[in-house]
């Protein structure tokens, strides 16, 4: 094996490592660090009219409970940005639950559980946002 061949293999490996490392170091790949999430303002008079009904959901209890929570507290869910980012066109955590997307995304489900837990503790929207930012921001 010649020195040129060894260097070309080494160079190829370094280039491959760079291709893998550069995206991993970018803010979009890693998440936002500890910046606050871009939480939307809840829309006045928002309802859960568009949240998927129970008959359209899988039998998994955790999923059904998250959708039920979105139906019970649409004003809170509409003021929280969904930290999973799997559907960036969604306006808020509430709009995630207007589709079947959360049935396969435990990021949405976990965020819903956190919102529900903090609401049961009597936390305000600002406090719930801070808890979401602390966990996911």
Label each PLM-derived region with a short phrase:
Residues 111-137:
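Short Fe-S-cluster ligation motifs
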Residues 80-115:
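Short, thiol/selenol-centered motifs that function as redox-active sites or metal-ligating centers
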Residues 24-65:
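C-terminal segment of N-terminal export signals and the immediately downstream linker at the start
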Residues 74, 97-98, 103-106, 124-129:
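Sequence context surrounding c-type heme c attachment/ligation sites in exported
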Residues 1-8, 18-23:
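N-terminal secretory signal peptides
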Residues 50-89:
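Short, charged low-complexity linear segments at domain edges
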């Amino acid at each position: 094996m010649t020195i040129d061949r060894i260097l070309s293999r080494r160079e190829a490996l370094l280039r491959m490592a760079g291709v893998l490392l550069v995206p991993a170091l970018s803010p979009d790949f890693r998440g936002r660090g500890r910046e606050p999430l871009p939480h939307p303002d809840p829309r006045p008079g928002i309802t859960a009219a568009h949240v998927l009904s129970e008959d359209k959901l899988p039998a998994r209890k955790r999923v059904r409970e998250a959708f039920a929570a979105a139906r019970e507290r649409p004003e809170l869910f509409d003021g929280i940005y969904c930290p999973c980012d799997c559907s960036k066109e969604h306006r808020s955590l509430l709009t995630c639950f207007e589709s079947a997307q959360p049935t396969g995304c435990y990021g949405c489900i976990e965020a819903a559980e956190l919102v529900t837990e903090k609401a049961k503790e009597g936390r305000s929207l600002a406090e719930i946002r801070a808890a979401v930012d602390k966990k996911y921001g």
